Amino acid sequence: MAIRPVKFSRLAQPTMEGAGVNLHRVFGFGDTKPFDPFLMMDDFRNDDPNKYMKGFPWHPHRGIETITYVLSGTVEHADSLGNNGSLSDGDIQWMTAGSGIIHQEMPKGNKNGAMHGFQLWANLPSNQKMTAPRYQDIKSKEIKSLVDDDGTIIKVIAGDYRGYKGPVDGIAAEPEYLDIYIPPLKFKRFPFDTSRQGFAYIFEGDGDFHNASNPVGIKVEKEFNGQEFELRDLSGNRTLVVFDNGDEVAVQAGEKGIRFLLISGTPIKEPVAWHGPIVMLSVSYTHLTLPTIYSV
């Protein structure tokens, strides 16, 4: 087995979207090649309702699919197909914009005013960009959780992991999307298909992906349960870690444990032309999109 080395890592960047929602952009609107088939990912997390309550009013999408994963709080949504509903703690929404859809997403937070979730954009291949739009809300009870003997918890949101199939299905990118918690100072390996590109995004605790390929030989600065460990190059909260080639990912959890998303997909390898929420093959197609969506 070949452990995937870290190609690069960086912190998510603060930005503002929608009608004034403060969030952190994990990646997006730049070079998409390291993330293909994924286009963008946002971490929307805030304890102050004034920084998210205005939400994301009516806006269009075309040529993409989105996966929204709510950790805490509530997001109310509606679209031009007549669908409406809400997402709460642990719920997911998968939306295929396809040929075009107009929708809104309005975060409401929880009883303490806290809101936390993620939205991931996946590209649609050229032969599916004009497919009929559709969406599905998935409740938290539908998500399988695996608990290892060492206390590691793996939630399978999409893909097939150790025989457990995630409820998010039918996405062109065929993503594997895992929410993983590893207890303090535990070392874990996770299989990773060699044909896929992928990344980890840390949102709680910290850990080491850089030196995890040699966990035993790392000298120890601190004693824990009779053993010594040195945790170098720790990556912490809001850190994106992008992997190079290999067939597994290894991580050494830090002293507080680590929780992260591990996401991969099969590259589409097609041109990407952005016009805000519209993603097509060329700029000429994006300019033709808005009039046709709003005329529906």
List where the protein language model places each region.
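Tight coil/turn sites that cap or link beta-strands
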Residues: 90, 98, 183-187, 195
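Conserved small/polar residues in nucleotide/adenosyl-binding loops
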Residues: 286-292
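Extended, compositionally biased flexible segments
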Residues: 46-112
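Glycine- and acidic-residue-biased ligand/ion/polar-headgroup-sensing regions
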Residues: 62-76, 193-229
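A short glycine-rich, His/Asp/Glu-containing loop-to-beta-strand
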Residues: 16-71, 143-189
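Ligand-binding loop in jelly-roll beta-barrel domains
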Residues: 98-128, 234-271
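Short acidic-glycine-tyrosine-enriched beta hairpin
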Residues: 81-94, 207-250
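Non-heme Fe(II) oxygenase catalytic core, chiefly the N-lobe of the double-stranded beta-helix
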Residues: 99-100, 104-165, 169-175, 182
